[in-house]
A protein has these predicted regions:
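N-terminal basic, amphipathic alpha-helical segments
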Residues: 1-132, 139-142, 327-328, 333, ...
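Active-site PLP attachment segment
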Residues: 74, 296-331
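Residue-level marker for buried hydrophobic side chains located in beta-strands
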Residues: 112, 274-275
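Short glycine-rich anion-binding loops that position phosphate/pyrophosphate groups of nucleotides
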Residues: 117, 244-246, 311
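Conserved core of the PLP fold type I
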Residues: 131-134, 140-271, 282, 286-299, ...
Length: 478
């Protein structure tokens, strides 16, 4: 007699053949019906379970289709051999090392981090309207797009960059991707050799390049940006720079230094390149921006231009773009033509219209007004809290952060600990030392004001003073 451990329920909303299939499959998986077992004939099992032959037949067919049983001619159905499972499952080994429980972090009262932007400035209504129109009118955007990005967005970006950043390129030179890190990782295999990066500088860019097999060397930054003298003696074939707003020092590379840098690259055509990360170029408050390095070099020059919408729109949009020199296009296409695009086509087309119809430039103008007011409020708060010779402010003219150098500063570790205790999220210039060596940039705060609310600015300076006082007291007692 054949017995099921689970009874069939005719009153259930689940069809009987599905109940029978589930019960038999479970018993086969558990080993209750061993592998190799000859299953009862359909009529016999139907009689024993008081169900129709069609019910048993339907359950058997599903079990056979899914590999639980195999039919043998003139013999019946047999449970597949490979379905036999151990009756006692192996114990799961413990983790190699249990992570200690994290201590509760003090709540952040003042967010002075450099990556913050204000989501309230995002153009929600316009963006939503454009996306809705595209969603209903352009179903073709659900299909695959160009690996370099939709041509409409690439053309809109090329036109915008030419007008506002002096970049000289065609749409075919523009590559759209989901973030600067993604684009850098694709660019890395095309680079001819060692890459020089700024120090202090952007750790993320260095890490991405190294993750993709590019050797990096760290070169000093002076009052005019990356030292070309140090670059010339470094043996590097590529340099990664942020000339519009050096991160994190805030230095803007002047025209003379830009010319020197281009001369360095032009001495070895096709063997030297400059990666220009046009970081924060949209936010220049007091003076007109200098033209991009790419614009100075031209479409056939040795400059790869990088930018992103993470600051101008929002980090969650995940749209970055790169302008390749024409001589790198064949290598790019040979390597990446099989790739798929990484940015939603609806997002791409929304941004294309946002730029083409003039919304982007108006949005940037509103952002500049808002962020300039925040910069002014933060500097006023700092100057009210500190004596004139106690705190030196630099890097005020561009971007969404500034530097504050503290006179007779306590150790940076003490400043970090005191800031954390006061609920202040901030960075110090030494955090961006890429050499990992001894501290070279002591006592300098890197203060972002992109995400700080207007109501917080009056207290920001006094809170930072409390941080400095607590750090000094802690240093004395150690």
């Amino acid at each position: 007699m054949f017995h099921l451990t689970t009874a069939l329920d005719a009153a259930s909303g689940v069809p009987l053949y599905e109940q029978l299939y589930e019960s038999l499959a479970a018993e086969m998986r558990s080993g209750a019906i061993p592998a190799g077992t000859r299953m009862p004939g359909k009529r016999r099992l139907a009689a024993e379970l008081s169900v129709s032959v069609n019910t048993v037949d339907a359950a058997y067919q599903i079990l056979a289709t899914e590999g639980y049983m195999e039919p043998r001619e003139r013999s019946g159905f047999y449970v597949q051999e490979y379905l036999a499972l151990p009756t006692r499952p192996e114990e799961v080994p413990p983790p190699v090392s249990a992570a200690p429980p994290e201590a509760a972090e003090p709540p952040v009262r003042f967010d002075l981090s450099t990556r913050g932007v204000d989501p309230r400035l995002f153009p929600f209504r316009t963006w939503a309207r454009l996306q809705k129109e595209l969603l209903y009118s352009s179903p073709q955007l659900l299909t695959h797009g160009d690996a370099q990005g939709d041509v409409e967005l690439r053309q809109a970006l090329a036109d915008y960059l030419e007008e506002y950043r002096g970049v000289r390129c065609t749409a075919e030179q523009v590559v759209v991707g989901a973030g600067m890190e993604y684009l850098l990782s694709l660019l890395a295999p095309l680079l001819p050799g060692k890459t020089a990066v700024e120090n202090p500088g952007y750790q993320r860019a260095k890490q991405v390049l190294e993750n993709n097999g590019v050797a990096c060397c760290c070169l000093p930054v002076d009052a005019d940006g990356l030292s070309v003298e140090a670059l010339s003696g470094s043996g590097a074939a590529v340099c990664y720079v942020t000339p519009s707003h050096q991160f994190p020092t805030g230095v803007t590379m002047p025209a003379g230094r830009r010319t020197e840098l281009l001369h360095w690259a032009s001495r070895c055509p096709g063997q030297r390149y400059i990666i220009e990360d046009d970081y924060d170029s949209e936010f220049r408050f007091d003076t007109p921006p200098l033209p991009s390095l790419q614009g100075m070099a031209g479409a056939d020059g040795p400059v790869v231009y990088l930018s992103t919408c993470s600051r101008s729109l929002a980090p969650g949009i995940r749209i970055a773009y790169m302008v390749l020199p024409r001589q790198l296009l064949p290598a790019w296409r040979a390597k990446y033509r099989i790739y798929s695009g990484t940015v939603s086509r609806f997002e791409q087309q929304t941004l294309a219209r946002f730029i083409r119809e003039g919304y982007f430039t108006r949005h940037l103008a509103r952002e500049r007004v808002a962020y300039k007011a925040r910069r002014d409020a933060l500097t006023a708060s700092l100057r009210a809290a500190f004596a004139p010779d106690e705190l030196t402010l630099t890097g005020l003219h561009t971007g969404l952060h500034l530097l504050a150098r503290l006179k007779n500063a306590p150790p940076d570790a003490a400043l970090h600990a005191a800031a954390k205790a006061q609920g202040v999220a901030l960075s110090l210039l030494s955090d961006y030392d890429l050499t990992g060596g001894e501290q070279e940039f002591p006592g300098t705060f890197v203060l972002g004001y992109g995400s700080l609310s207007e109501a917080s600015f009056p207290e920001a300076g006094e809170t930072l003073r409390k941080v400095c006082t607590a750090a000094r007291e802690a240093s004395v007692t150690v």
